C-alpha cells in the first residue's frame, strides 16, 4: 500500500503530462488517504481542477491513467461539481494539494 508521500511524489513527477494532455490546473487528494485512514481495499479520492473542462471520454481516460499510474483505483471528482454544502465542506477539510 502506497503512502501519501509516495502518491504525491508520483503525481508531482507527472504534472507536465497532466497539464499538457489533460489540461489539469490543480490536483488534490482527499478522503481516507488524506486522513491516513486507508486500508488495502481503499480507493484514492482525487479532486481535480481543469484549465478546460474535458468531455466525458477525456475525463474517464484521466481517471484510468491515474489509476494505472498509482496502482490504486482512483475516484476522480471535478472541483466545483460537489453542490451539497456538507459534502463540500468535508472534502475541503481533507484536501492535500500536490
UniProtKB/Swiss-Prot annotation:
GO MF entries: ATP binding; metal ion binding; nucleotidyltransferase activity
Q: Which cofactor does it need?
A: Mg(2+)
* Classification via InterPro entries: NT_sf (IPR043519), Polymerase_NTP_transf_dom (IPR002934), Type-VII_TA_antitoxin (IPR052038)
In this record, what's one Pfam family? NTP_transf_2
**Binding-site list for Mg(2+) 1:** 43, 45, 75
Protein family according to the UniProt entry: Belongs to the MntA antitoxin family.
Quaternary structure, from the entry: Probably forms a complex with cognate toxin MJ0127.
Put simply, this protein is called: Putative protein adenylyltransferase MJ0128
